[in-house]
C-alpha cells in the first residue's frame, strides 16, 4: 500500500521545491488528499485552538449530545443507522460576513482565538490554490479569481466532536461523501482516529499527526480542472473510546461564482477528452448537493449538465 502523502511546505523555499511541487501534484491527481507539516501556522496557536475547542465541547455540548442519543435510542440500535451521524457540531462563518459574534455559548476568548485561526487558514488556503495553479499551468490567482464571484469566496468552519460510540459497526461518525466546495483544511485530533478516504476500492486511514493540516479537494476543483484533480469519497468511523476533535474549514466559491472547466485545461486535453463537466452557478450546485450529499457525485454533475442543456434549449432563456 502506498504511503499517505505528507507534504513539508518549508521545502518549497529551498532546493527541494521541484520535488515538493511534484508530490503535491501527485497527491491531487491520485489521492485528493494530503497532509501538511511546517505549514506556517504557529504550534501555540493550534494548541490553544485544540484546548479551547475540547473545553467548549465538555462545557456546552457533551450533555446535549448524550440527551440526543438517549432521545433517539441510539445506544440500543440493532441494525445499521443510515440516516444520521454520530457527531456533535456547530458552524462558524468567516467570509463574506462573519457570524462568530452570533454563535451562542462561545466565550469571548474562544471567539477571538477562532477568528485569528480562521484568518491564518484563509491565507494558507489561498497559498495552496496558487500552488495548484502553478502545477496546472494556470496563471497565478486564477482559482482565487474564479472562486470570487461578485462578493468574494465563502469560507467557514465546521467544528465537530465525535464522542465514544457503543455501536461503531452500526453507526458512522459521518457517512461517506465528497465535499461540495473548493479546498478544505482540516485540523484533526492527533490521538483519536476516525477519518478515512476511499482509494482503489479500499478505505484508508488518514493518519492523525500532531499539529498537521489535512487538505482535501472538493467537487468544484474537480470541475475546474476538468477531472485532472478529483474530489474523493471520505467518511468518519466511530470509536468505542475517546472523543475525536475535528475542525474542517471550507474555502469555497462565492454563491454567485460561475464554475466551469478552465479553458486552457480543456484545450490541453482536447485530443484525449473534451469538457466533461458542466458550467453552473455555485449556489445552484449547493442546492442540489443539499439533498444528495451522501450519494455519488457523478449524478450531481449529470444533473447540472441537464439543467444547463434545458436552459440552452429554452427559447425564452436564450432570447
From Swiss-Prot:
Annotated pathway: Alkene biosynthesis; ethylene biosynthesis via S-adenosyl-L-methionine; ethylene from S-adenosyl-L-methionine: step 2/2
**Where Fe cation is bound, by residue?**
177, 179, 234
Give a GO biological-process term: defense response
Any Pfam family matching the protein: 2OG-FeII_Oxy
Tell me, using the record's free text, what induces this protein: Up-regulated during the early stage of hypersensitive response.
Molecular functions (GO terms): 1-aminocyclopropane-1-carboxylate oxidase activity; 2-oxoglutarate-dependent dioxygenase activity; L-ascorbic acid binding; metal ion binding
> Broadest EC class?
oxidoreductase
Q: Which cofactor does it need?
A: Fe cation
Which portions of this protein are annotated as coiled-coil regions?
none
The reply to whether Metal-binding figures as a keyword in the UniProt entry is yes
**SUPFAM superfamilies on file:** Clavaminate synthase-like (SSF51197)
Q: Return the EC number.
A: 1.14.17.4
Q: Which InterPro entries match?
A: DIOX_N, IPNS-like_FE2OG_OXY, IPNS-like_sf, Oxoglu/Fe-dep_dioxygenase_dom, Plant_2OG-oxidoreductases
Record keywords, A-Z: Ethylene biosynthesis, Iron, Metal-binding, Oxidoreductase, Plant defense, Vitamin C
Domain Fe2OG dioxygenase: residue ranges: 152-253
State the reactions this protein catalyses: 1-aminocyclopropane-1-carboxylate + L-ascorbate + O2 = ethene + L-dehydroascorbate + hydrogen cyanide + CO2 + 2 H2O
Query: What PROSITE patterns does the entry give?
Result: FE2OG_OXY
Query: What's the family?
Result: Belongs to the iron/ascorbate-dependent oxidoreductase family.
- In its UniProt entry, what is this protein called? 1-aminocyclopropane-1-carboxylate oxidase
> What is the scientific name of the source organism?
Nicotiana tabacum
Q: What is the lineage of its organism?
A: Eukaryota, Viridiplantae, Streptophyta, Embryophyta, Tracheophyta
Q: Which gene encodes it?
A: ACO
Amino acid at each position: 500500500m502506498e504511503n499517505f502523502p505528507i507534504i513539508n511546505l518549508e521545502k518549497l523555499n529551498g532546493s527541494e521545491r521541484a520535488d515538493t511541487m511534484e508530490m503535491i501534484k501527485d497527491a491531487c491527481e491520485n489521492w485528493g488528499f494530503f497532509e501538511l507539516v511546517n505549514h506556517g501556522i504557529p504550534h501555540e496557536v493550534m494548541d490553544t485552538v485544540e484546548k479551547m475547542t475540547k473545553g467548549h465541547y465538555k462545557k456546552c455540548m457533551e450533555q446535549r449530545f448524550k440527551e440526543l442519543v438517549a432521545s433517539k435510542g441510539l445506544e440500543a440500535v440493532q441494525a445499521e443507522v443510515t440516516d444520521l451521524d454520530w457527531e456533535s457540531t456547530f458552524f462558524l462563518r468567516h467570509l463574506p460576513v462573519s457570524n462568530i459574534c452570533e454563535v451562542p455559548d462561545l466565550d469571548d476568548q474562544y471567539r477571538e482565538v477562532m477568528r485569528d485561526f480562521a484568518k491564518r487558514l484563509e491565507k494558507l488556503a489561498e497559498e495552496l490554490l496558487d500552488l495548484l495553479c502553478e502545477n496546472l499551468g494556470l496563471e497565478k490567482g486564477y482559482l482565487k479569481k474564479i472562486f470570487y464571484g461578485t462578493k468574494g469566496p465563502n469560507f467557514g468552519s465546521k467544528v465537530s466532536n465525535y464522542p465514544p460510540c457503543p455501536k461503531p459497526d452500526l453507526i458512522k461518525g459521518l457517512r461517506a461523501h465528497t465535499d461540495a466546495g473548493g479546498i478544505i483544511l482540516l485540523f484533526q485530533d492527533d490521538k483519536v482516529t476516525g477519518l478515512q478516504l476511499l482509494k482503489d476500492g479500499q478505505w484508508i486511514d488518514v493518519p492523525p499527526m500532531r499539529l498537521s493540516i489535512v487538505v482535501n479537494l472538493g467537487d468544484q476543483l474537480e470541475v475546474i480542472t476538468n477531472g485532472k484533480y478529483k474530489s474523493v469519497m471520505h467518511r468518519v468511523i466511530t470509536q468505542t473510546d475517546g472523543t475525536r476533535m475535528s475542525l474542517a474549514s471550507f474555502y469555497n466559491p462565492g454563491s454567485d461564482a460561475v464554475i466551469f472547466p478552465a479553458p486552457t485545461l480543456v484545450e490541453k486535453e482536447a485530443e484525449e477528452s473534451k469538457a466533461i463537466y458542466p458550467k453552473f452557478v455555485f449556489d445552484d450546485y449547493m442546492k442540489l448537493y443539499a439533498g444528495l450529499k451522501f450519494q455519488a457525485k457523478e449524478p450531481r454533475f449529470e444533473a447540472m449538465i441537464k439543467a444547463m442543456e434545458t436552459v440552452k434549449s429554452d427559447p425564452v432563456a436564450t432570447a
